[in-house]
Amino acid sequence: MSQKKILLLGGSAQQVIAIKTAKELGYYTVLCDYLSDNPGQYVADKYYNASTTDVEAVYQIAKDEQVDGILAYASDP
């Protein structure tokens, strides 16, 4: 069985706990955030510089990465 993938929307300091928890649960973590200085990019397995409000970009990332789920944790858009 292959590793499950989760796309997390946003990589602020408040969201790092969700990224870490997903990794602890065995998920491959994919992150998207338009802020280039977000701390989550250093925790996630893969990072995309894309706005979480850009529905088309988020959809394309999810499709390309073949994620099993999408999580918005402590996001504010």
Predicted regions and their residues:
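ATP-binding N-terminal substructure of ATP-dependent carboxylate-amine bond-forming enzymes
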Residues: 1-77
